[in-house]
């Protein structure tokens, strides 16, 4: 108990809150009224008063209004930018962002299929007799069977190449 009395004597007694409210920021004497208002405003205790200034965007001379022509021009520019980005996305010029499932081999197959159909139609138009058409059709079927037999090997090679490229890229 003596230790509690010693510590109380060293630090002194706590004061009770003043009943008259002298601890209030409003009662602080800072000189003139202007300094008092500034102090209260900085402490977050003062009420903000309207200073007579315009609110941003209120005055027509300071705000920037667009005319109808400017709106149309801006919309056309935005539309053209959008179309350019969509065209580049759809045409596939930007191959960096293809993702993990992308394979160049699939595109090569599609192009080859497109060329073979073009080639087939040109042969049909050139040949005049039925026998020539039958022979060309048989040749095309044989070539397609040969292509089908080669495709699984190519797919396996493409997959292994793709995996190796992926492993190399992730390892570095």
Curated annotation (Swiss-Prot):
<protein>
    <recommendedName>
        <fullName>Small acidic protein</fullName>
    </recommendedName>
</protein>
<dbReference type="Pfam" id="PF15477">
    <property type="entry name" value="SMAP"/>
</dbReference>
<feature type="compositionally biased region" description="Basic and acidic residues">
    <location>
        <begin position="142"/>
        <end position="160"/>
    </location>
</feature>
<feature type="compositionally biased region" description="Acidic residues">
    <location>
        <begin position="123"/>
        <end position="138"/>
    </location>
</feature>
<feature type="region of interest" description="Disordered">
    <location>
        <begin position="1"/>
        <end position="172"/>
    </location>
</feature>
<feature type="compositionally biased region" description="Basic and acidic residues">
    <location>
        <begin position="46"/>
        <end position="76"/>
    </location>
</feature>
<feature type="compositionally biased region" description="Basic and acidic residues">
    <location>
        <begin position="112"/>
        <end position="122"/>
    </location>
</feature>
<comment type="similarity">
    <text>Belongs to the SMAP family.</text>
</comment>
<dbReference type="InterPro" id="IPR026714">
    <property type="entry name" value="SMAP"/>
</dbReference>
<feature type="compositionally biased region" description="Polar residues">
    <location>
        <begin position="80"/>
        <end position="92"/>
    </location>
</feature>
<feature type="compositionally biased region" description="Polar residues">
    <location>
        <begin position="1"/>
        <end position="10"/>
    </location>
</feature>
<dbReference type="InterPro" id="IPR028124">
    <property type="entry name" value="SMAP_dom"/>
</dbReference>
């Amino acid at each position: 108990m003596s230790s509690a009395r010693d510590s109380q004597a060293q630090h002194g007694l706590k004061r009770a809150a003043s009943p008259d409210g002298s601890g209030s920021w409003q009662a602080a004497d800072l000189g003139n009224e202007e300094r008092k208002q500034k102090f209260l405003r900085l402490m977050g205790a003062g009420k903000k008063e309207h200073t007579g200034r315009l609110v941003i965007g209120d005055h027509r001379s300071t705000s920037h209004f667009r005319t109808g022509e400017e709106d149309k021009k801006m919309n056309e520019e935005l539309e053209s930018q959008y179309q350019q980005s969509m065209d580049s996305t759809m045409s596939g010029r930007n191959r960096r962002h293809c993702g993990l499932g992308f394979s160049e081999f699939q595109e090569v197959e599609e192009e080859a299929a497109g060329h073979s159909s073009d080639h087939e139609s040109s042969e049909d138009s050139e040949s005049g007799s039925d026998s020539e058409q039958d022979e060309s059709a048989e040749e095309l079927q044989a070539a397609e069977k040969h292509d089908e037999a080669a495709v699984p090997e190519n797919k396996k090679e493409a997959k292994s190449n793709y995996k190796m490229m992926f492993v190399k890229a992730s390892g570095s």
